[in-house]
Amino acid sequence: YVLGLVGAGVALAPLGFRPLGYGLFLLYLSALLASYLAFGDRAASERLLHPFHSPVGLGFMGTLGILLVLHLRYPWPFRVLLGLLGGAVLLLSASRGGLLALALGGAGSVLFQRRGWLALGAVGAVLLLAGTLEVPIAERFFQTHLSGREGLWLAAYEVFQAHPLTGVGPYLLGDGLKGVLFGECFLFPFLEMRGVACPEALKPFGGLWVFAHNHLLQALGESGLLGALGLLLLVGGFLAGAWGDGLLFSLLLAFLAMGMVDNPFSVPSPFRGEVFFLAGGMALARGFQPPLALGLAGASALLLSLPFLYLATRPAPPPPSLLYAAIPPGEGVGVVRLSGQGYRAQVWLCQRGCRRLGWEWDGEKPIVFAFPKDLPPGRYELRLVLFSQHRLAKKPRYVLPFEVKP
């Protein structure tokens, strides 16, 4: 599949990426429509949703649209509209990874074209708008937590430690990551919000779409050292082929930047990862420079490792303490308050198995959660799981159990 995409990219090199802009335009409109159908008048205060894209992925697709607009000569009305919609999607998705991709892609484009400065200006414009908008989602652009990715990174690294040479095989890493951020099987946020849970028949396969949220760790877990080396050489070859082309280089660099905190070029996908390999094929059609490819492969390895260097230098937070826990029987809701800074909290409800309640909370603020309405009566164990944001949060730092009767 990957080789076919690269070959298609070589064949489509004369055509370029102009058709992608029209597809992104339709994607943006469908995302705005889906969010309005899901949230109604609250759509502007909630993260953008799509039936088969996560908010993080939507933000990255917004970045791709902005980069296309800055480098390709679409008709002016469409060019302006696509750029505005791409910026709106990036802003409303509150995707810090998408913003990082735009910043790094723009910086890479500056090496060859002055238009790269416009991409960096777009980053500043998004941050300026986020700072002036009085909506909760805009605050995400100024937060430094990793939304629980630390736990996924650790789990993927532990799989790599157990299988350092060969990994566990393609699409099998997710079995070791299930339950870290979501349950055993999780569909797209839009579907889950609409009450479409993962069918029982799909639950054994839930690991197929659970990823490490870092491409280097994904490769190490799936394919071991040899596979990770192959991925880095492939990326280095793509970047070397794109050297000198502002659009191709910025697109590939944006994918690589996003690869620090997500898996944007995993395939098959809803035509996101496919764009990366098509771009790689177009880059290889321009030629191949082995020395430059090796150097850029090493730079890619360093870039994908930056999150771990960042975490390793963060100081340990002070131990937390429980201020109060109010979980009245039969009310269907609970509130827990902690003291202590630097923690992210997750709430899990366990009986025979465990299910996650809500998403994730800032440990410094009241943790308000609701119990599922279809919960069978009985006694349960409620687990408040606290992750720190330093040294990869190797395991949950603290687990506070409560016996509850929802």
Where are the regions a protein language model picked out?
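Interfacial juxtamembrane loops and adjacent helix segments
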Residues: L172-G221
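Transmembrane alpha-helices of multi-pass inner-membrane enzymes
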Residues: L248-G295, P307
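Hydrophobic transmembrane alpha-helices and their immediate junctions
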Residues: G116, E222-L253, S388
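Short, compositionally biased P/S/T/A/G/V-rich stretches that sit at domain boundaries
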Residues: P307-V335, P406
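Alpha-helical transmembrane segments of multi-pass inner-membrane proteins
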Residues: L3-A44, H50-F112, G237, G241-W243, ...
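Membrane-interface micro-motifs in multi-pass membrane enzymes
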Residues: L49-L64, S95-G97, A212-H215, L220-G224, ...
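A membrane-periplasm/extracellular boundary helix in multi-pass inner-membrane enzymes
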Residues: Y36-F39, L92-S93, V110-L146, L154-A162, ...
